[in-house]
Amino acid sequence: MTECDVRVDLSGKRALVTGASSGIGAAVASALASNGAMVWVNHPSGATLEAAEAVVTGIVEAGGKAQPIQADVSREADVLKMFATLASKPLDILVNNAGIAHSSPIEALEVDDFDRLMGVHLRGTFLCTRSALKIMYAQNSGRIINTASQLAYIGAPGFSHYTAAKGAILSFTRSLALEIGERPITANCVAPGATMTPILADVPDDILEGIRQNIPAGRIADVEDIVGAYLFLASDAAGHFRGQCLSPNGGDAFL
């Protein structure tokens, strides 16, 4: 993984990144660590432990600090257990990034598949935020960064369930920022455009080329193009950003 060259001072900060065993989550975890934060690399199951450990190993070998931590964020019991592990420690940064994606026309979309996607994206964001806020309120500081998507704004055929979940995360973030109010805790989100992650790895080349042609920057983003937005929102420089959404998308959409 190519290292992001954005630099902020996160020395002494502690961060939890959900869905951090691959893709954007792994890149964000690595970038936070390379800027001084100690990072918990969340992954959902035993099947993803090896990938999470590889992310942790990369961080440690680069001189950073990280630990894997398992929880299926769609399951309340898992989230409560994960945060029980963190409860005695500060939590300065929460990145809600866990997500899944698959395409289906509405008439063929199974209810179980709809519920599972909503559970990981929206329920997971809610559950982790609820637990994190208890820590952040007690310490009177923190950064919450949720992962939405450019598609939440513009839609996409075959992804009605995915765009609905991401749109809900946008609204959740805005209301959360208002609820937090004057406290020195921020809630914002990042809405990436098309990014080369494992989700896009199986997309046929002709479709990827069509996506690329619609991007004024001339290419689909790498994960390193995305993480700068997360680093900024995690930093002290973003203290006056509340309920905002940054969308690194190469000019594909003006949001």
Q: What residues fall within each predicted segment?
A:
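Short C-terminal tail/terminal secondary-structure segment
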Residues: 2-6, 154, 214, 230-231, ...
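Conserved glycine-rich Rossmann-like NAD(P)H-binding loop of the short-chain dehydrogenase/reductase
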Residues: 37-52
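Substrate-binding pocket helix/loop in short-chain dehydrogenase/reductase
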Residues: 105-106, 110-118, 200, 211
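Active-site helix of classical SDR
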Residues: 129, 165, 173
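Alpha-helical segment proximal to the catalytic Tyr-Lys
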Residues: 134, 178-182, 239
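Residue(s) in the substrate-gating loop at a strand-loop-helix junction
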Residues: 149
